[in-house]
């Protein structure tokens, strides 16, 4: 089984969601039991809704448990910052053409959220930055065309 990189923050969020779902599980079972008491199961909307909710909850639990089982948790805060861009690093780049400054944290696929500045380790920008150092200039082929960035700061937050 191949390990999948995940930040410590990503692991924490998954564990919190798993905990929430595990606490929800008995409530769903209770709702199914109450709906069963209402009689005929063929036309019992409450029963069918509770069973559907149970199926969704169980699928989410299995999915999270699987993700945690294959996760290789990388906590960059415990690493010495060498100025090298690695998984989990927060990188501030300057677009050489527009002088626009952008900050990205390189995270796992499930953690990516471009609006929050978290980009997937498999994205073109992350692939172009990983392995480079603070002060390097990199040319990256993006869906919007070729971009040239200067790596301004590399932080292990």
Swiss-Prot record:
Protein name: Transcription elongation factor GreA
Family of this protein: Belongs to the GreA/GreB family.
Functional description taken from the UniProt entry: Necessary for efficient RNA polymerase transcription elongation past template-encoded arresting sites. The arresting sites in DNA have the property of trapping a certain fraction of elongating RNA polymerases that pass through, resulting in locked ternary complexes. Cleavage of the nascent transcript by cleavage factors such as GreA or GreB allows the resumption of elongation from the new 3'terminus. GreA releases sequences of 2 to 3 nucleotides.
Molecular function GO terms recorded: DNA binding; RNA polymerase binding
One GO term of the biological process aspect: regulation of DNA-templated transcription elongation
The entry's keywords: Coiled coil, DNA-binding, Transcription, Transcription regulation
Coiled-coil ranges (or none): 14-37
Organism: Vibrio cholerae serotype O1 (strain ATCC 39315 / El Tor Inaba N16961)
Entries under PROSITE patterns matching the protein: GREAB_1 (PS00829), GREAB_2 (PS00830)
Segments traversing the membrane: none
Classification via PANTHER family: TRANSCRIPTION ELONGATION FACTOR GREA
Domain of life: Bacteria
């Amino acid at each position: 089984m191949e390990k999948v990189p995940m930040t410590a923050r990503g692991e924490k969020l998954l564990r919190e969601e798993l905990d929430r779902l595990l606490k929800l599980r008995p409530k769903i079972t209770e709702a199914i039991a109450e709906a069963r008491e209402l009689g005929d199961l063929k036309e019992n909307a409450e029963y069918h809704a509770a069973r559907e909710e149970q199926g969704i909850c169980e699928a989410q639990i299995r999915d999270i448990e699987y993700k945690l089982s294959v996760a290789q948790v990388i906590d960059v805060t415990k690493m010495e910052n060498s100025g090298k861009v690695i998984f989990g690093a927060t990188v501030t780049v300057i677009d050489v053409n527009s002088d626009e400054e952008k900050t990205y944290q390189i995270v796992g696929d499930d953690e990516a959220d471009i609006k929050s500045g978290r980009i997937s380790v498999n994205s073109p920008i992350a692939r172009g930055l990983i392995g480079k150092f603070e002060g390097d200039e990199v040319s990256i082929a993006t869906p919007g065309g070729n971009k040239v960035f200067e790596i301004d700061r590399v932080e292990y937050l």
